[in-house]
Amino acid sequence: VLMLLALLVGCATSRPPQRYAWVTGLKADKAERYEYLHAHVWPDVNQMIKQCHIQNFSIHECNINGQLYLFAYLEYTGTNFDADMNKMAADPTTKNWWKQTDPCQTPLPDAAAKGKIWSDTKEVYFLP
């Protein structure tokens, strides 16, 4: 048993998670609804997020000159981000969740041009 444990520990790769962040607008008249939904996230939505190798997921709200924005951050620990995101997008509960949350959001022009809600960001600094 000790030998097997040593082999498992030796074979385990300890790669750091990949960090992702996005930004989108939040409709002022839907902000309360959006906050309510996220204060009461459906358990199956959280479970799917975890099944897709996502950890430390957070969404922050910011008011800039009267316009509301959402900033989302997550860490991905899997090996195929696109496949996991496709898995999440195909999940019926997640689709229904997005039908609730998407109308609260206002995509920025770059995301809207691609038919997306969230705009990609580029990491410019990280302190481990």
Predicted regions and their residues:
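Short beta-strand micro-motifs enriched in acidic
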Residues: 60-64
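Short amphipathic alpha-helical segments
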Residues: 30-55
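Sec-dependent N-terminal signal peptides
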Residues: 1-8
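An amphipathic, aromatic/His-enriched active-site/gating alpha helix that lines ligand/cofactor pockets
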Residues: 48-55, 75-119
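A generic structural motif
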Residues: 67-74
